Amino acid sequence: MGSAAMDTKKKKEVSSPGGSSGKKNPSLKRRSLRVHIPDLSSFAMPLLDGDVENSEKHSSRKVDSPFSSGSPSRGLFSRGPQPRPSSPVSAPVRPKTSPGSPKTVFPFSYQESPPRSPRRMSFSGIFRSSSKESSPNSNPSTSPGGIRFFSRSRKTSSVSSSPSTPTQVTKQHPFPLESYKQEPERPESRIYASSSPPDTGQRFCLAFQSPARPPLASPTYHAPLRTAVLAAAPGPAEAGMLEKLEFQEEEDSESGVYMRFMRSHKCYDIVPTSSKLVVFDTTLQVKKAFFALVANGVRAAPLWESKKQSFVGMLTITDFINILHRYYKSPMVQIYELEEHKIETWRELYLQETFKPLVNISPDASLFDAVYSLIKNKIHRLPVIDPISGNALYILTHKRILKFLQLFMSDMPKPAFMKQNLDELGIGTYHNIAFIHPDTPIIKALNIFVERRISALPVVDESGKVVDIYSKFDVINLAAEKTYNNLDITVTQALQHRSQYFEGVVKCSKLETLETIVDRIVRAEVHRLVVVNEADSIVGIISLSDILQALILTPAGAKQKETETE
């Protein structure tokens, strides 16, 4: 009896372990809970498994998620009367909890009661780490590509529904969303732009955008927005933009329009896409160097010293004239110094009395600085050297700068002094004019070049009329024809072998306006104009330096500054 009763009890326990009449086995209960734990965790985090239906089913538990949204109505940049910062990633959001709530292992923010209205991320969400970049309303994406996609499509989130008062405000962000209700363009493209494109010459259309981002819809600026953005994040990149903005908005007279134009452009803007640049090593013979200038049709070349691994000077036609002026003795006598000396030897002899370092300029410097350096140092060639690599990029001249300015003159307001004539402005040299006659020997002309430090001599006949002009560039023909051993020939004989680079004699009158003078000297591509009277007699000389001084430096007050410096 006893054994039969015990067998019957065991059978009941095996046949119905979960029944109400039998006792439950504790080991079976624990094993059952272990089996269902993964199901419960997946039910608690439907978004991690990509279950869209579960996400819609639990829409009553939607809260502010630290992940950005791709929806245009619930995007990252939804407008509203007051911004609301996002909650921490790992802290559950509850209606009445402090920001310092304890962390949990669940990345999904849970809210006990449904919110009264949709709640969105504030502007501060874009400054969070990449671990937050996913969307509760779309398929999850944890790759960096998805992060960049949402950060680059912020303009699509311009439409949003009007939100209600947020239940939790922990921090007021320095960028209020009210200033972006009419967002003309992305502010980041102005703040973090690597470089601004060259200006088109129109001083009231200064657009800045980054080449790494798509073109903006509107280049127009709104003053309050620009001021707020630039004031909130100042830095080295903004310094140049702030300077240009000040140039755009400053209230100056029209007389300084060309000065402001030159200050807003860099030397790199004037460098051509393709050009020829000849560089000489200081160990090269002087004679071969001048022959190379003639063969390449250039008037100057930077000098490279291998010992210092840097540029130390310039070799110009003036050096050729100085060598002939110093070492020429008599006709048909070989000039040993010209034949045998190297460039470094000539520099040691010539510069031992007055050593002058190389005057150069950076490609990032303004054209105003280039003009000021040319006129202040009384030079005609200014090499543009990259300070980082040390490479020579280009050689700036008065002619190149004035031509660049003249291209944009029609797009700028015309100052009143452009309608004044040369006599009223007093531009040019009208006293103690140096000139020569057709029968003047070449050696005498070279002496005048050196003593007066001028670049050209008008050739005047017996009646006083200007018949020709002898410039420094014509002297290089002596090297081309190898006739520099006989400098007693006349100027007329030397000019008979003039090369095709002759600029010609371009004349003007003192009664012509400055606008006419600028247009004529640029079109003729010459370095100077000979001012004559009604009888075609020489009255004065107006050079490119005089014109640039009147257009750019005089309105800036640089003339007085130069006098004080000297």
UniProtKB/Swiss-Prot annotation:
Coiled coil: none
Source taxon at top rank: Eukaryota
Residues that hold AMP 2 according to the record: 299, 399, 471-474, 498, 527-528
Ligand binding (ATP 1): 299, 314-319, 359, 380-381
Protein residues bound to ATP 2: 299, 381, 399, 471-474, 498, 527-528
SUPFAM superfamilies per record: CBS-domain pair
GO cellular component terms attached to this protein's record: cytosol; nucleoplasm; nucleotide-activated protein kinase complex
Residues binding ADP 1: 314-319, 359, 380-381
GO biological process: cellular response to nutrient levels; fatty acid biosynthetic process; glycogen metabolic process; intracellular signal transduction; regulation of fatty acid metabolic process; regulation of glycolytic process
UniProt feature, compositional bias: Low complexity: 15-25, 132-144, 156-172
Disordered: region residues: 1-198
InterPro entries to which the protein is assigned, alphabetical: AMPK_gamma/SDS23_families, CBS_dom, CBS_dom_sf
Similarity annotation: Belongs to the 5'-AMP-activated protein kinase gamma subunit family.
Protein known as: 5'-AMP-activated protein kinase subunit gamma-2
Gene (name only): Prkag2
